[in-house]
Amino acid sequence: MSKNILIVGASGLVGGEILKNLKTTNNDLILLSRKKLLCENSINQIVIDFENIDSLDASLKVDEIYIAIGQKLSLSELVYIKKNNRKSFVNVDYNYIKKVAEFAKNCGANSVGLISAIGANTKSFNTYLKVKGDIENEIKLMLSLIHISEPTRQAEI
């Protein structure tokens, strides 16, 4: 049976891989992104300013959601995010993710795949890891079937 799968962040490296893998299935794919992507006409694309997530049409049917969005950070920012950049980071990596998960839940989703980070922990003193832990916990309370991936950055040789 075909599912309606919402992919958030398909323009990024990990989200692009999720899209590539799901294209081989017999499911209906819906992309939620900031800009239109070059892909097959059979893939439904919703272009939105993530500040306006609440304006999305909740009559959309969604069975699963994959969330692979996040603020672009330098390697040093994984250790320390400057005070003046923290608000933007929290907005993308917590608020946007929470809102798209709520949207998907309101559209019928019961399954979520979330890209997070190794070491995510609500009690961490590291802003990056604390926010990742906070959103993981928020998502766990929201949907019944949760898959959290905590990939690591691979060094290029």
Label for each model-derived stretch:
Residues N4, D63-E64, S111:
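Structural motif
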Residues I5-T25:
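N-terminal Rossmann NAD(P)H-binding glycine-rich loop of SDR-like oxidoreductase domains
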Residues G15, C39, L75-S76, T122-K123, ...:
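Glycine/Thr-rich phosphate-binding loops of Rossmann-like dinucleotide-binding domains
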Residues I30:
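Conserved beta-strand positions in the Rossmann-like core of class I SAM-dependent methyltransferases
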Residues L37-L38, I43-N106:
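NAD(P)H-binding glycine-rich loop region in Rossmannoid oxidoreductase-like domains
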